Amino acid sequence: MPWLQLELEASPDNAEQLSELLHAAGAGAVTLQDAADQPLFEPPPGTTPLWNTTRVIGLFAADTDIPAVLACLQQQLAPVPLPIWHLNPLEDRDWVRAWMDNFQPMRFGERLWICPSGFTPPEPQAINILLDPGLAFGTGTHPTTAMCLRWLDAHPPRDLAVIDYGCGSGILGIAACKLGAHHVSGIDTDPQALLATHDNADKNQVSDCIKAYLPADFRAEPVPLLLANILAGPLQSLAPRFAKLVAPAGHIVLSGILAEQADSVMQPYQAAFDIQLVAQQEEWVCLAGQRR
């Protein structure tokens, strides 16, 4: 299937906004491209994990009304003018190559590196995750993923069973395996995410450690650690289910939450967890709690 690639020039100040607007306009995927071959290290909380010169690229179906997309972007950005943009047709195999060319290694905490497969890890002795996002994206560039990865780096789940709820590309579950988890169950509502998780687990030689399921197919005993990087609304709705999935004295890590949503997300968890805000990056927060 052919695609249309809409590319917009961006600065670190507006790249995240453009990414969100492209998603809202119907982009099947959005990537952030380094325009100057600059290595990207995961910065401290509160700073933006973007290159100095960034291109924001949205992938649209070939029959998309691109002028309507551009008009929507301009309306949302006003009074700021629409950035310089380019539109190119792209075959499936070209998109995969473009993604791999533009996704650069990133470091999280003291030990974790996320690298595209086929790329020589900058620190071979570190804990390196080789990642191809496939159709279910999650690469560490978004603050919510970055905060979860740093939490895992600081609290390695050695010999623990872990649930990665909303596994996407499998990045958090694979990181947990690499950091010593005994077993990880990835759960996602999107079958493509399950495929991406299993493919990425194979690339990282942890396929024996992680298995992915649709929610209806998942049955498990309570685990010592549950990770969920999804959205505030589903997190609130899932609080009773998560309380059953986490063992007494076990831990839960939640992200995908805007700062102003933190209190409303914590509220349904307080009946079963001692939960608090543990990190904030830009407008996003990460919550962590212990099961009573």
Predicted regions and their residues:
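Conserved beta-strand elements of the Class I
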Residues: 129-130, 163
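Conserved short alpha-helix immediately C-terminal to the canonical SAM/SAH-binding motif I
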Residues: 192-196, 234, 261
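Conserved SAM/SAH cofactor-binding pocket of Class I
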Residues: 135-219
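Active-site capping/gating segments
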Residues: 257-292
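N-terminal auxiliary segments of SAM/dcSAM-dependent transferases
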Residues: 2-124
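A short glycine-rich, Lys/Arg-flanked "PGG" loop and its adjoining helix->strand segment in the class I
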Residues: 236-251
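A short acidic, Gly/Pro-enriched loop at the edge of an enzyme's catalytic core
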Residues: 218-226
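Amphipathic alpha-helical repeat scaffolds
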Residues: 200, 228-229
